[in-house]
UniProtKB/Swiss-Prot annotation:
GO terms for cellular component: cytosol. It catalyses: guanosine(527) in 16S rRNA + S-adenosyl-L-methionine = N(7)-methylguanosine(527) in 16S rRNA + S-adenosyl-L-homocysteine. The gene is rsmG. It is an enzyme of class 2 (transferase). It is found in: Cytoplasm. Its EC number is 2.1.1.170. The keyword Methyltransferase applies. S-adenosyl-L-methionine binds at residues 81, 86, 132-133, 147. This is Ribosomal RNA small subunit methyltransferase G. GO terms for molecular function: rRNA (guanine-N7-)-methyltransferase activity. Specifically methylates the N7 position of guanine in position 527 of 16S rRNA. Coiled coil: none annotated. The keyword Signal does not apply.
């Protein structure tokens, strides 16, 4: 059954990628499928995501993360409130030249991420178990990523110590919410709002770049 599921996921991933401008190596595709298989396996015991169907995971978790990749500027990124490593793990897989710190305060999520990093042999990921406001990095980041983590105001307030001077906040959101934008501290400005196209995903997705 596992081999059959793996084949189904490989074929599904190929179809999904054809609807994007992303170009992935066969190894990267293999790693992404393996990540879904790991998430599916661990999810049964640890309840890491409400998405139960592995094919849905490809759309709602993997592709939803990958479409951010073309907009990443810089080399060092932190994914705050990463949950089961989203969007950090998929982005790390297809950006081996960039470094990613994956931060979350829940132990079971970090156990999964550490296991995934080992299984996928990722050398550009550092899992960190911590609350974001208590985390003091040795070096600041070119980009601070968040997906379903907090409001824009909370994200920028809690994470203001993390980016370099010209660093960006990358907030993955569903609806583009004007009220959320208005609540931002005046020291932050919206650089760009990008409407993301995620193959087979129902509902709107936006990437909001904040400086």
């Amino acid at each position: 059954m596992a081999n059959n599921l793996e084949q189904i996921l490989r074929e599904k991933l190929e179809i999904l990628l054809q609807s994007t401008a992303l170009s992935l190596s066969s190894q990267q595709k293999q790693q992404l499928v393996k990540l879904v298989l790991l998430l599916n396996k661990w999810n049964k015991a640890y309840n890491l995501t409400s998405v139960r169907d592995p094919q849905e995971m490809l759309v709602k978790h993997i592709l939803d993360s990958l479409v951010v990749s073309p907009y990443l500027r810089g080399e060092r990124f932190i994914d705050v409130g990463t949950g089961p490593g989203l969007p950090g793990l998929p982005l790390a897989i297809i950006n081996p030249d960039k470094k990613f710190v994956l931060l979350d305060s829940l132990g079971k999520r970090m156990s999964f991420i550490r296991n995934a990093v080992r299984e996928l042999e990722l050398t550009n990921v550092e899992p960190v178990l911590s609350r974001v406001e208590e985390y003091i990095p040795d070096h600041k980041f070119d980009g601070v990523l968040s997906r379903a983590f907090a409001s824009l105001k909370d994200m920028t307030d809690w994470c203001s110590h993390l980016p370099v001077n010209n660093g960006l906040f990358y907030a993955l959101k569903g609806q583009y919410n004007e009220d959320e934008i208005k609540q931002l501290d005046e020291k932050f400005t919206i650089q760009q709002v990008i409407k993301l196209d995620v193959p087979e995903l129902q509902g709107k997705r936006h990437l909001i770049l904040i400086k």
